[in-house]
Amino acid sequence: MLLRYLKSYIYNSVAELRDTSFFDEEDIRNSEYNIKRNWYYNNENMPDLYGKKATITDETWFTTFRLYPALTKFFYGRSENLSLTGSYRDRMKFRLSETYLLLCEARLGLNDISGAREAINVVRRRAHAPEITDSEMTMDFLLDERIRELVGEESRRFTLCRTGKLLERTRKYNTESGPVMRDYHTLWPIPQSIIDSNTGAEFPQNEGY
């Protein structure tokens, strides 16, 4: 999957995103204009490499420092500051496409499969992705579609908790956290300071902590 790890989009010393066949071939959200995978040497002090494409393989991508791939929705690539690890580009807070995806989720909750399919296909048509049928319309497909549409934007944990899929999908797709995920991890521990400050009644800790 494009999101190999669900780590709240916190950068560390290795790339967190990996490209696979997660998108349909026609889907423009997977284009080089949206997800940059091709990088070229631009250091004039390296004449043997200058202008040539950097080679990133399946064996080396994971150790490529904050590079592969990059989401251009957040990335300026301004030549005056090549060391810039972020950008000042505005972040989307509300998007029409997510409204349709939320409508799809609501209709799934009502078991209105055709209505859910109609809602998600509005987003897929705009992305030039093939429309899906009722038989393909599942909560898992919707969660995958949210990755394709909102990668880097949504608070994924909240989405997975809301849909009751946190444990299942973390254990299935997250090779780092999945093996140690426990049922009680759907909730976080309540800070002890909050518990202590509640003097009017007993304030129990969440189970497992």
Where are these regions (language model features)?
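Long, intrinsically disordered, low-complexity segments
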Residues: 1, 86, 90-93, 124, ...
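Flexible, polar/acidic helix-loop-strand segments at domain edges
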Residues: 1-95
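Extended aliphatic helical segments
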Residues: 14, 28, 56, 113, ...
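Extended, hydrophobic/aromatic-rich amphipathic alpha-helical segments that build helical scaffolds
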Residues: 27-33, 91-123, 139-149
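Amphipathic alpha-helical interaction segments
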Residues: 41, 47, 108, 166, ...
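Intrinsically disordered, low-complexity segments enriched in polar/charged small residues
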Residues: 71, 78, 100, 112, ...
